[in-house]
């Protein structure tokens, strides 16, 4: 008798995606981050749902409602900090997942890659709006500064900003709509994840060598299910340690002060996971130029497949490209550090240099190095 998981209309979809899926036998731990992102998304949706049950999106009571969650709701402090630090864990996994794709040439699956870029933008938008919701000082001023950047768009900029604000400043209308969108977007992200997986399963997974592995496939279950579960345990242990021992490590102390439009914090900065893009934004003196550089710092991922000039897919056997890749990683760490520093010497020039190098490596040095490697290998 045929197993029900292979005949049932719903179960056979799950079976072909997570049980009998043929997977390359050589996948390393770098392939764990996709499933870890799924766990992060589930944690965020669940904790967010429970937070939304107690949260009020009215400027008069918002800050107090968050305090109430932490003090009076059963395990409210745990739910709140799991949600806040879960976002950090989400972005750590997200950046490692994108880095894996760049290193091993997974971007040659263009549909999967492009849906992934859409996912990245959607998650960033969700995180930005979520940061506004506690209505602390950094929430308010972060929202004011970042939304104000849209005023750099010629002709329609000012009207666009006021339309997003729902008035002439960030206020009750802004908070209410940000809460609505922050609640809605994770479900759109979930739908996009399904599209992402659909396109991935059309082509099959890449592997560390970048060489087609059709002749050497193994079933996803039990091999990779066990491996993924180990990844879940490690990540959830790290998240639990962060939440239980130093929940405010990655947050900003200014956000424990209620939002005050009359008092500007000394250093306005976003959460740590946006600092690299914020540093690129600040490194250009012109407002519109800065906004374009900010968008391009992430949108540049969309043209990476076009810039692939190597005859090999993966960087596994390309030491020169590997050096450039790790230099790019170092530059991203530098930009993250600079984004959190005040705008003064020597941070300004360091940020500008790192920003130029970031674009230079991706747009020019990597394609040229790939061509040089082709020549050296006589391909």
From Swiss-Prot:
**Tagged with keyword Lipoprotein:** no
A Pfam family recorded for this sequence: Cytochrome_B
Localization, per the record, is:
Mitochondrion inner membrane
Its BP terms in the Gene Ontology are: mitochondrial electron transport, ubiquinol to cytochrome c
| Signal peptide as annotated in the record | none
Which Gene3D superfamilies has this protein been placed in? Answer: Cytochrome Bc1 Complex, Chain C
**Cofactor(s) demanded:** heme b
Question: Does the record carry Electron transport as a key word?
Answer: yes
Q: Name one GO molecular function term.
A: ubiquinol-cytochrome-c reductase activity
Segments passing through the bilayer: 33-53, 77-98, 113-133, 178-198, 226-246, 288-308, 320-340, 347-367
Q: Which residues are noted in the entry as a ubiquinone-binding?
A: 201
Instruction: Give binding positions for heme b b562.
Output: 83, 182
Known function: Component of the ubiquinol-cytochrome c reductase complex (complex III or cytochrome b-c1 complex) that is part of the mitochondrial respiratory chain. The b-c1 complex mediates electron transfer from ubiquinol to cytochrome c. Contributes to the generation of a proton gradient across the mitochondrial membrane that is then used for ATP synthesis.
Write down the PANTHER family for this protein, in alphabetical order: CYTOCHROME B
Quaternary structure per UniProt?
A: The cytochrome bc1 complex contains 11 subunits: 3 respiratory subunits (MT-CYB, CYC1 and UQCRFS1), 2 core proteins (UQCRC1 and UQCRC2) and 6 low-molecular weight proteins (UQCRH/QCR6, UQCRB/QCR7, UQCRQ/QCR8, UQCR10/QCR9, UQCR11/QCR10 and a cleavage product of UQCRFS1). This cytochrome bc1 complex then forms a dimer.
Q: Please share what else the UniProt entry notes about this protein.
A: Heme 1 (or BL or b562) is low-potential and absorbs at about 562 nm, and heme 2 (or BH or b566) is high-potential and absorbs at about 566 nm.
Q: What is this protein called?
A: Cytochrome b
What's the gene? MT-CYB
